[in-house]
From Swiss-Prot:
The gene is rpsO. Part of the 30S ribosomal subunit. Forms a bridge to the 50S subunit in the 70S ribosome, contacting the 23S rRNA. InterPro entries: Ribosomal_uS15, Ribosomal_uS15_bac-type, uS15_NS1_RNA-bd_sf. SUPFAM superfamilies: S15/NS1 RNA-binding domain. It comes from the Bacteria. HAMAP family: Ribosomal_uS15_B. This is Small ribosomal subunit protein uS15. GO terms for biological process: translation. Belongs to the universal ribosomal protein uS15 family. GO terms for cellular component: cytosolic small ribosomal subunit.
Length: 89
């Protein structure tokens, strides 16, 4: 199941650094985290769905790259972000 447009808008408002900010790493990581959570729930009932599992691995990799970027630029911002999202890292 994908994210509804309303949920995506709420995530953008919550994690945006300023109005209209949809491209900051914080917003992108928040949206990816939501999609990863949805796919994780999907796999609890559809264990053999390997095509979607590949998509999940791509999303996790993309999120990790963005988090590494934030960590390299501003470590306190990185720590605050993973704390807010509840990511175990």
């Amino acid at each position: 199941m994908s994210i509804t447009p309303e949920r995506k808008t709420a995530l953008v408002k919550e994690y945006a650094l300023k109005d209209g900010d949809t491209g900051s790493p914080e917003v992108q990581v928040a949206i990816l985290t939501e999609r990863i959570a949805n796919l994780t729930e999907h796999f609890k009932t559809h264990v053999k769905d390997n095509h979607s599992r590949r998509g999940l691995l791509k999303l996790v990799s993309q999120r990790r790259q963005l988090l590494d970027y934030v960590k390299g630029r501003d470590e306190p911002r990185y720590k605050a972000l993973i704390e807010r999202l509840g990511i175990r890292r």
